[in-house]
A protein has these predicted regions:
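Active-site mouth of glycoside hydrolases
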Residues: 1-88
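Substrate-binding clefts and catalytic carboxylate motifs of secreted carbohydrate-active enzymes
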Residues: 51, 58, 64-267
Length: 267
């Protein structure tokens, strides 16, 4: 049962109208910006939309509104089911359109793209793997290698993340922000307005690139290791005598730079 007090795109034509108007306004603002590649209309739809009919209808309306003011930028179309179901979204309705899919939490196999490559070839529309990540370095290397072997462009999520080890930049979790998180989870007292403001400003400062911990092994796995088995030193500054941390093993693939029995699959 639809509750009109809550936001729902697919149950409200009024909200769909607002989305169309919003995208037209965005396109008006950025129509001449050459450094913007295009517009990804809706991220990871996950709704019961039989035949993809309503999804396509809304996409077509947004596209038409954008094209009234901007005929230059790419239109990125994500499928249903978190961008992986393109039922009803073919054939294309614009001559500058890309189909965008995502991949998370599943193993990497040689046939992982077999479900979507035929759509690219049959519809003559490029593919874009618009979001992936949250996994091991070996997983990154394997999947990116597969994408590039099949001429599929890609983007990763995310470049910076709080207190994590699977993004290129790790952001330090400050105590004030942890207090906010504890309160949200019902596990702590409510911060004062002043405490919350100070905590968020400290987090914003921690998010600056110069204040993040750079994990060089991740970009190495994503770019260099996709084309070579070569092993290179983790850092040119490490010398003996001196201290070398155990974690600073050489940069390279498993079984070449290091050996680990659990490195990939869907973790």
């Amino acid at each position: 049962d639809y509750d009109s007090s809550k936001a729902s795109l697919w149950e409200s034509t009024a909200n769909q109208d607002k989305l169309v108007a919003l995208w037209k306004k965005i396109a008006e603002r950025y129509k001449d910006n050459e450094w913007i590649g295009g517009y990804d209309l809706i991220n990871e739809t996950n709704w019961d939309l039989p035949g993809g009919t309503l999804l396509r209808e809304v996409f077509e309306r947004i596209t038409a509104a954008i094209r009234e003011v901007d005929k230059n930028h790419i239109i990125y179309i994500e499928g249903n089911d978190y961008a992986n179901n393109f039922t009803g979204l073919t054939p294309p309705w614009d001559d500058n359109m890309v189909y965008s899919f995502h991949k998370y939490w599943s193993t990497v196999n040689d046939d992982d793209l077999d479900w979507i490559l035929p759509m690219r070839d049959q519809q003559n529309v490029p593919l874009w793997m618009g979001e992936s990540g949250e996994n091991s370095n070996t997983w990154y290397t394997r999947f990116i290698s597969l994408l590039e072997k099949n001429d599929v462009g890609w983007a990763w999520w995310t470049i910076k993340k709080v207190g994590d080890i699977d993004s290129p930049f790790s952001v330090k979790l400050n105590p004030g922000y942890q207090k906010i998180l504890d309160y949200w989870k019902g596990e702590g007292d409510k911060p004062t307005e002043e405490e919350a403001y100070a905590a968020m400003m400290k987090l914003a400062d921690n998010l600056l690139i110069e204040n993040c911990l750079y994990r060089k092994d991740i970009p190495d796995a994503m770019f260099r290791q996709t084309t070579t088995d070569e092993v290179i030193p983790y850092s040119k500054k490490q010398t003996i005598p001196g201290r070398i941390d155990l974690s600073d093993y050489d940069l390279g693939k498993n079984n070449f730079a290091y050996y680990d029995t659990s490195v990939s699959d869907n973790r």
